[in-house]
Amino acid sequence: MQIENSGVGRILRQLRWVLYPRRCPFCDRVLGSVSACPDCKEKLETLRRRPTFRLARERHYIKNLEGAAAPYRYAGCVRRGVLRAKFQAAPWAADELGVEMARLLFGSEVRMRGFGPEVETVPGLAIGYNCVVPVPASSRVRGYNVPERMARSVARAVGVPLEPKLLVRARSGKRQEGLSFDERLVNVSGAFRVTDP
């Protein structure tokens, strides 16, 4: 039995929320007992995208990719939230970004229970999905894996397993920062491979 999903795990998470209250990943405001930041709600709506889960064949950039989704444009407070998770020693921001992704993409809800939040798993939420697979993080040391933490929050919210070892880095690439869209596509081409299941 994993501690994370046990009664002990829930108690430890509650204790964590008492000592380190939830914060908005976008503006860093302490959220207290609210499930989402009221200050960022309007800003986030302007950055909202309509997710595309099934891609038309002619829009595939990655061979055999059946679907992809990005709930927000990478700008404004969303960009600040991602940068906070990546570069400001804020693993909690990665967790909260994952919760937000699950909320927007799958309709999961954050409910306040006791001293902190519990992401409510909605049965059948992820029908058609077997697992959540994070993109492998680069080798730069942060002390935690941002994509894996985000993916763990999504997996927990939709009730499917997290499989962090299914996709591995096949080769190193340049930093994506400062590259154009086309340069980014070339940079990640062949950078990852699927492991044997």
Where are each of the predicted segments found?
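Glycine-rich phosphate/pyrophosphate-handling loop used in enzymes and phosphotransfer proteins
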Residues: M1-P197
